[in-house]
């Protein structure tokens, strides 16, 4: 299963287009679990991809012709396609379906990939060609061409191309360390999350917890070959426990476990990693001439600088702070009504008594809505909404190999029946998957047509878009029933997915969600709040 999935995602654009055209007539994919050393598959391809990209860069640098937009900027944008595909698979699987070998590979390759990037971005001859085009063409080009030129030139500046030799060397050292430490940080969080279980054997300790969550905890215990019930730090288990469990001691225990991840005296402690990341980021920002890392990061955001961010936050405080204090006071009042005047509200109490107050004031319990949000029906509703709004259709494709048996693949078509994208949806938590929800691409869209020619689906390389969540799992007795919040999360990430699905650009580096990170939330907010 996963081996065939990886192989398919590593195809060249031409091979991929041929592959998906023939999928409908292919037999259904065998997506049962299989033994696969993904790291062993990917390692030689990534190393080879780095060598190939350097050869492509050398060709640009050694081009005897004067630098032009086509032979320098576009040529550079088209380098490293094989490397990009292989690293996309590696990093996406690190988040969605990781294992020890894959994490070891990522740790091994992080400094190598950082050095590879620096060897390109700090190449003086290459930057000279880029700057020559930028100086000559920046006020002449329009649209995507101008965006590609500006983004390329600024990318070199932000990667140290204008620094002194001494600062360039320090920049290399910093970025190598950052690549290792940021990766290690994420790996530690996942492992620490998976390490904790709250194992309950006395049913009295489940008081207050609705049957649906008890059943899920019982199935979790069975999967671990344990008696009783198991609650974890994954959201579908952790959040209901905090909201409903009457056992205050256990609420405190699981709350502290969740909020103290990677702070213990063990191999997963992130204190020094965080301190090092902060200091290294500050140093790299200052080397590049920025006041601090916030200003460096925000230069590529709509907000532009930290001053604008703080102004927005300070303006908002006047509108929400009094209301927030009032909400906390009301919850504390409710808690004292139940527990007595001497009761002191703690962080692990807030969700529990907040839910009690909501039930009293509004007769509202979020679990009351779950039967209306059965996952298969929600999928139909969300995809159907896209059909109604945008005219696109989704056809389930069981012939496409996926990386895990719960993943569902859809072919996406526009209103005229032209192929737009493949959408993968991966809904449920597992130990090999990080928490939260996100959208990503396994393959980016790009167009083979010449610039300024209208892009149509039949002359572009269509993307593979993935929506990954951690929704409540189904059990043998109960289908997957979502909360309203989970439905909103699905719509939010689906908005990001539509941004990728509708992509129609000439250059992959500008495709879909490759926009300012604050602007990228517009399609997701639109779908979430529609």
List PLM regions with ranges.
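N-terminal helix-rich structural modules
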Residues: 2-209
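Short His/Asp/Glu-rich catalytic/ion-coordination signatures at enzyme active sites or charged loops
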Residues: 18-41, 89-109, 131-173, 232-272, ...
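Surface-exposed patches in mature extracellular/periplasmic domains of secreted proteins
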Residues: 60-64, 396-399, 524
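Active-site-proximal, well-structured secondary-structure segments within enzyme catalytic domains
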Residues: 144, 148-149, 177-180, 187, ...
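Inter-helical turn/loop segments and adjacent helix faces that build the functional surface
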Residues: 162-168, 392-398, 501-510
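Hydrophobic alpha-helix feature that most strongly marks membrane-spanning transmembrane helices
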Residues: 164, 259, 428, 472, ...
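Active-site recognition of the HExxH zinc-binding catalytic motif
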Residues: 282-285, 289, 386, 484-501, ...
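Post-HEXXH active-site segment of zinc metalloproteases
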Residues: 479-489, 500-526
């Amino acid at each position: 299963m996963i081996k065939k999935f990886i192989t398919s995602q590593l195809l060249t654009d031409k091979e991929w287009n041929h592959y998906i055209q023939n999928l409908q007539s292919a037999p259904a994919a065998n997506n049962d679990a299989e033994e696969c050393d993904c790291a062993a598959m990917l390692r030689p391809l990534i190393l080879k991809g780095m060598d190939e990209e350097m050869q492509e860069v050398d060709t640009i640098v050694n081009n005897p012709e004067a630098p032009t937009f086509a032979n320098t900027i576009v040529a550079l944008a088209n380098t490293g396609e094989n490397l990009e595909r292989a690293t996309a698979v590696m990093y996406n699987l690190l988040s969605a379906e990781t294992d020890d070998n894959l994490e070891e590979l990522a740790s091994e390759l992080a400094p190598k990939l950082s050095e590879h990037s620096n060897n390109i971005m700090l190449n003086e001859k290459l930057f000279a060609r880029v700057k020559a085009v930028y100086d000559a063409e920046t006020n002449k080009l329009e649209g995507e061409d101008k965006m590609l030129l500006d983004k390329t030139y600024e990318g070199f500046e932000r990667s140290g191309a204008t620094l002194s030799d001494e600062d360039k060397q320090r920049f290399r050292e910093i970025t190598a360390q950052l690549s290792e430490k940021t990766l290690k940080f994420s790996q530690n969080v996942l492992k620490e999350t998976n390490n904790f279980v709250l194992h309950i054997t006395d049913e009295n300790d489940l008081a207050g917890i609705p049957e649906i969550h008890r059943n899920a905890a019982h199935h979790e215990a069975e999967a671990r070959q344990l008696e009783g019930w198991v609650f974890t730090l994954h959201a579908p288990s952790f959040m209901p426990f905090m909201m409903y469990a009457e056992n205050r001691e256990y609420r405190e225990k699981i709350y502290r476990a969740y909020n103290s991840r990677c702070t213990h005296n063990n191999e997963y402690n992130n204190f020094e990693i965080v301190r090092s990341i902060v200091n290294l980021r500050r140093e790299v920002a200052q080397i590049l001439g920025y006041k601090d890392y916030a200003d460096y990061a925000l230069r590529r955001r709509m907000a532009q600088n930290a001053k604008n961010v703080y102004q927005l936050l300070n303006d908002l405080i006047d509108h929400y702070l009094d209301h927030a204090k009032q909400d906390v006071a009301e919850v504390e009042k409710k808690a004292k009504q139940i527990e007595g005047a001497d009761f002191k509200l703690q962080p692990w109490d807030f969700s529990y008594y907040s839910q009690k107050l909501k039930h009293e004031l509004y007769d509202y319990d979020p679990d009351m809505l779950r039967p209306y949000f059965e996952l298969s029906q929600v999928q139909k509703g969300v995809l159907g909404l896209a059909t109604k709004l945008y005219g696109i259709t989704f056809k389930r494709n069981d012939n496409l190999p996926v990386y895990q048996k719960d993943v569902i693949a859809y072919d996406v078509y526009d209103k005229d029946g032209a192929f737009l994208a493949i959408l993968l949806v991966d809904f449920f938590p597992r130990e090999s998957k990080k928490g939260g929800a996100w959208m990503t691409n396994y393959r980016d869209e790009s167009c083979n047509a010449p610039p300024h020619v209208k892009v149509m689906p039949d002359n572009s390389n269509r993307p593979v878009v993935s929506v990954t969540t951690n929704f409540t799992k189904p059990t043998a007795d109960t289908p997957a029933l979502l909360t309203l919040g989970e439905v909103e999360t699905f719509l939010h990430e689906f908005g990001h997915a539509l941004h990728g699905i509708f992509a129609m650009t000439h250059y992959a580096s500008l495709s879909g969600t490759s926009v300012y990170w604050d602007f990228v939330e517009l399609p997701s907010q639109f779908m979430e709040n529609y």
